[in-house]
Swiss-Prot record:
<keyword id="KW-0496">Mitochondrion</keyword>
<comment type="similarity">
    <text>Belongs to the complex I LYR family.</text>
</comment>
<dbReference type="InterPro" id="IPR052000">
    <property type="entry name" value="ETFRF1"/>
</dbReference>
<dbReference type="GO" id="GO:0090324">
    <property type="term" value="P:negative regulation of oxidative phosphorylation"/>
</dbReference>
<dbReference type="GO" id="GO:0022904">
    <property type="term" value="P:respiratory electron transport chain"/>
</dbReference>
<dbReference type="GO" id="GO:0005739">
    <property type="term" value="C:mitochondrion"/>
</dbReference>
<dbReference type="InterPro" id="IPR045296">
    <property type="entry name" value="Complex1_LYR_ETFRF1_LYRM5"/>
</dbReference>
<protein>
    <recommendedName>
        <fullName>Electron transfer flavoprotein regulatory factor 1 homolog</fullName>
    </recommendedName>
</protein>
Length: 157
């Protein structure tokens, strides 16, 4: 019980960090000009653009770490297991660790969110299927007993 409480507080801490990064004012993360062209400007805004780029990298790093943690949690909770998910996810995360283009990073983030939703759906389906199996056997026994009672009463008459 204490483990889940500490894990929840850790997740909320990560969410707060991400919210703080999104709510930074006077700095737009998605400017219309490319980062390379904006750093070449001689208007004196070079320092702001570099900070902007650092903020974007920091935000993406937090998001990716949170997604990896969600995958590990799903492995712990679900029927696949942590080892299976880690063996599949870690090479993918490592192969994409050197990406620098924000569009490609966002594509990978969206793909990971999709995979998380699919794993959640698989876990729910697995749970539903197991519950259905257990109840089907129970109801089958009840129905068999009920039918046996009907047959016994018909024999008595």
């Amino acid at each position: 019980m204490e483990n889940t409480h500490s894990m929840i507080s850790f997740k909320t801490l990560n969410k707060l960090k991400i919210q703080q990064l999104f709510s930074i004012k006077n700095k737009s993360f998605y400017s219309t000009s490319s980062p390379i062209s904006s750093t070449v400007n001689s208007s004196g805004n070079d320092n702001i653009d570099i900070e902007n780029d650092k903020e974007i990298k920091k935000k993406n790093r937090l998001i990716v770490k949170d997604l990896y943690k969600q995958l590990m949690y799903l492995g712990r909770v679900g029927f696949l297991g942590v080892d299976y998910i880690r063996d599949k996810a870690k090479p993918q995360f490592i192969s994409n660790a050197n990406l620098t283009d924000n569009n490609k990073i966002n594509e990978c983030i969206e793909r990971t969110k999709y995979v998380i939703k699919e794993i959640e759906a698989m876990n729910r389906f697995h749970k539903y299927r197991n519950l259905k199996k257990s109840y089907d056997l129970e109801f089958q026994k009840v129905n068999d007993n009920f039918l046996n009672l009907d047959n016994d009463q018909n024999k008595i008459k």
